[in-house]
């Protein structure tokens, strides 16, 4: 999300969180602060293998509520982010294709507030590809998670019937865009109303 008017329109839909990508290799990269930042939903900063000082600076500059780590950050690295854990929630993303991919979550139990389960794809997130959600039935961890990975307008019924005691929400990204970083308000509105 980069465009102030688009941010306002998405926020008006009553969403809980809005993501801002701070990974320079992403087509959704936020290179400069938008003229408007949301005030009625949580601001999520998405980082990929970023250094601690940069995360801290951006978290302060954007008044972030949540940090999403979408790279190969280790539990040890996360434990060295005390400035985050005292005032911000942390989400650790995992790329999922099979039940074996869920094993790594055990190392992060107690280190983060939420997991995000995304599709294992060619790039880091935003691939627009789905994974088989049935593999999540084997997830028995204590950490709540967000469901991600190519969820599109056609998936409303799938989302409605998906149940897991630790699933707290869904992440909508590339399948709801007019262009990278610019959401299609009509698609989002229709999808949200259908839930």
What are these regions (language model features)?
Residues 1-195:
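Conserved N-terminal beta1-alpha1 strand-loop-helix module at the mouth
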């Amino acid at each position: 999300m980069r465009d102030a008017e688009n941010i306002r329109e998405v926020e008006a839909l009553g969403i809980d969180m809005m993501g801002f990508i701070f990974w320079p290799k992403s087509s959704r990269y936020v290179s400069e602060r938008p003229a408007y930042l949301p005030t009625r939903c949580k601001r999520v900063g998405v980082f990929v293998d970023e250094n601690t000082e940069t995360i801290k600076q951006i978290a302060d500059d954007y008044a972030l509520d949540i940090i999403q780590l979408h790279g190969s950050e280790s539990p040890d690295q996360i434990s060295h982010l005390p400035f985050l854990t005292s005032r911000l929630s942390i989400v650790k993303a995992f790329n999922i294709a099979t039940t074996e991919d869920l094993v790594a979550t055990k190392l992060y139990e107690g280190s983060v507030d939420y997991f995000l389960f995304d599709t294992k794809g060619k790039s880091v997130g935003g691939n627009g590809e789905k994974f088989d959600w049935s593999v999540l039935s084997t997830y028995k961890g204590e950490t709540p998670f967000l469901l991600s990975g190519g969820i599109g307008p056609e998936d409303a019924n799938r989302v409605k019937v998906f149940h897991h005691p630790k699933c707290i929400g869904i992440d909508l990204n590339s399948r709801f865009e007019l262009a990278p970083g610019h959401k299609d308000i009509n698609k989002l509105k229709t999808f949200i109303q259908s839930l």
